[in-house]
Amino acid sequence: MHRQLVASIIFILDNFIYRFDHMTEKTNDTKKAVDALWKAYQFTDELAPLMEWIEESISKSTREINTNSASQTEELQEKQEKVLDQIDKKRKTYTESKTKGEKLMTDPKAPKFLQSHIDKLNEMWKQANNEAENRLKQLKGMYVVLRCMSGCQLAITSINHLSLSNASMF
């Protein structure tokens, strides 16, 4: 009887240890998932100011502009060059954020929404650069056209004055 009791206790203890080990494994998996989720949310919180800044940069490069003088266009061109310079200065922050996000994605427990945030960051960064460069090209082209128009207007004015001067001689 004593042996049966010992065998029964050993069986119960083995069973208990097995369940404990199994539960510990699940607990560790859950802890890893929670840690990955926490890091992902922390990353998206850190990403928010950069995303807002990129949106502002895009809006600076896409808002409607009206200019009809070379000097005004030149001022807008200088402002756009500053936007491009600011984008270039933020490149390090963008690269660090992108790298951090990609590193977080290597964790098998990383939440799926993290990839969409990284994709959106990359897409917006590319758009900000493209829009800023396109706007600068447009302004440079517009500046050349306005300078040519200004030169043509001066030539026409000179021709008109000459014509009027010659007409008054007759």
What are these regions (language model features)?
Residues 1-170:
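Extended alpha-helical rod segments
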